[in-house]
Every structure is written in structure tokens, then in C-alpha cells.
Amino acid sequence: MTMADQGSRFGQPEKICDIVLKGGITSGVVYPLALVSLAEKYRFSNIGGTSAGAMAAVAAAAAEYGRHIENAGFDRLARIPGELGPNLLSMFQPTPALKPLFDIFVAALKAKTKTGRIIAITSAAIGGYWLSALLGLLPGGLVALIALAIGGGTGFVAFGMLLALAGLVAGVVWRLVKAANTDLVGSDFGLCPGIRQPYSSRDGFTDWLARLIDEAAGNETGRPLTFGDLAAPPDGRPAIQLAMMTTSLMEKRPYTLPMPEDHRFVFEKSEWERIFPERVMAFLTTQCDRFTPPAGEAGEYYHFPDPARLPLIVGARMSLSFPLLISAVPLWRRDFTLLEEAERNKLRRCLFSDGGLSSNFPIHFFDRLLPNTPTFAISLDDYDEKRNRDDVWLPASSGSGSQLPVQPFDGLGGFLMRLLMSAKDWQDNLQSTLPGYRERIAHVVLKPEEGGLNLTMDEATIRKLV
């Protein structure tokens, strides 16, 4: 069955809507079944998102494209929770060089108490950098052994043991600093590139998402689904518009994907091979024009794809580049603000990081003076037992949702985090309280152990969220 299925619950929805999805890393597991539920009554015309919301947005766009294809469409999205439950952590695969650092991060996530967290971090650090720990331990250990052998007394033995302990700490700390300053920087400031690593037999999250997009779209052509495909679905069905945010760190500005055709960016093949699946790279290198750098830089460069040839997986990955956890996406362009022609001709490397740094909730994406379809939005919020009775709520009156909650913080770490969040989210927060916006935002509240950076959520927690 490849044509419209009148008997399917997704066959012919009478209503049309737009949807915008907020970012939130693993909090995005709440989206698939919410989209499935909406898809029973609505056809999605315009779909937008940021970060994890961008992942859900491309999945929704692919499902809308494949709505009438057997085992594809929203039937495919309905199976996502069962896949994520046992596999979420395994999808985040650090590079081999950064695996010890990632294991320290995971150990900290799994610990339930402050004391347990300290013990877990220490054990993971020593286990991950055991050679550096051993080399640091050796001098003091030798002093202690020699003192014991010659009967040097407890003072010399104690000195040797203290020296060994100090050496162990110094060795591990030195290796941690080296990993952060060298390995992490070399991985474009992210532990996980997104694709399967040599030590693993499982897909990384980019591999999984690329496959999900094709399966939801019913795409069996072997090439990735593109924004151009969404603009011209088969059988004369209406076009699907998809948009997402990304952030150019070197330019200190956001971009909406797909970019306009005059963007002037190029990508270098070997760099992108580290973050995109082979079949995606095969498509890009055959569809995108080669670029010859005027200054003769080494490498194999291609023009960034125009909207018609931009794969959905590339847009999603550029939006989902959570700093330090997921590596940034490199592009290159010339800087025409420079005075010297020789300098203007040189390619400058630009890192694209998480779209949530610029706008984590781009509810403005599809605004029009005279909208002809409603825009729904899903916001992922923090749970507060004094404020939230329901896990999901909508403004119930004209004044509901017009004010922002007062949210205290603790300590220096909380202060620094709140500074960052205030600078990053103030515009989204204010916009979400405006009349005409707040009435169409569904708020999903999550507890501290749910969503966010909690990569170690068990299957039961994930199923509860969805």
C-alpha cells in the first residue's frame, strides 16, 4: 500500500497546522508521540525546531512526506520510544581519544549523591587515564619502597606515600587538562561527533537519525531526503516547509536553515566525513560543486548545498551541536571585511554550534500578518511541585502564561549558569508571554532527573516521559 490509506488514522486529516519544537537534548524524547497524536487530526504544513527540537522537526517532516506510505510516516515515529529506551546512551559515542573524558561525565550523571559523585568521578578518571596515574604514582612509590627496604623509618615511608598520592593526582589532572585543551579542541569542542566510532557496533545518533528520516519518509532511493524533496512531495501533495536554527560562533550570529543561496560557505570533505554517514557524504560530494580556494588551501572543498539539495540530516546536525557534548560543524568562507586582497582570499574556518544558543524556542518562524493555519508550539519546562499539578498544561485563560516564574538558584555554579541562561533565553522567554503566542504553547514539565543532559535515563523513565 503506497497510496493514500483511507482506513489509516493518519490517512486524510481535515485540519492543517504549523508546529514549533523547543530544544532540550534528551528532553526531545517527549516529542515523537506528541507529534503522532497531533498527526491524527492535523496535516503539518510548516515545521520548525531547535537542537533536539530540530531532530524531532526533521522526523516530523519526513513522516509528513511519507504519511501515506505503509510502515512509514507517523507509524514509524510511533516506534521511536521503544528504540530509544534501551539504546539512548549508546548513541552518544565519543571519539576514542575522548572516551575517558566521556566516561567521567557519565559516571557523574549516574551518581546519586555528592559523595558518590566525587568517588565516581575519581574512579573514572583514574581508570580512564591509568597510565598517567601510574607514571605519576611511580616516583613516590619508589621512595616508599626504598625507605621500607633500607629501614628508613615511618617518616620516609609516609613521605613516599604522600609523594605517590600527589603524583597520581598530578598525573591524572595533567592528562585531563591535555584532553580538554588538545583532544576536545581537535574534536571541535565536542566529545561526540555523532557517527559510529571504531570501537562500537551500534549507530551513533546521526546515523540513527539519518536512517529514521529515510524510513519515516518511505525513501528507498539510497540518497538522503532533502529540503527540495519536501518542497515537491509526490502525487501532487502540498509542500512541507521545514526550518531550524544554528549558531555561527565565529560570526556571533544565528542562521536559519536552509540558508539562502548567497551564503558563500564551503565545507571540507575530510572534516565532514568525521560527522556525517558515508552515504550522506557520497550524495553531497556528487551534488555539490567543487570549490577551488583562491589562496590554495589544502583540502577538498565543496560549496554548501543550496536548499533544494540540502539533506535534512545536515540541517538537524548543524542545529544539534550542544557545546562540549556534541562537536560543532565546521564550514569555511572568505572574510571580505579585511583590507588586504591576499587576506580576503584566504578561507576562514567557521564553527556552527547549537541553535539553542541563539533561539531555543523559535516560535516566530512562521509568523504572518494574516495567518491561515494555527501554529502550535511545545515548550519543555522545569518541574516545580509548588507550581505544577499536571505534567502538561496549556494556558486556560487570557491572563494565564502572561508572567514568568521566579526561579531561585544556589551557589556560584547556579549564578554562572543563570547568567548564561538569561543572556541566551531572554528573547524567547519574553516572546512566549505575549498575547497571540502564549495561548498556543503547550508546556511539558520535566523533573531534574528527566531529559536535559541525562543520557543515562533508564527505559522506564523514557517511557514515562513519552
Task: Label each PLM-derived region with a short phrase.
Residues 1-466:
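Patatin-like phospholipase
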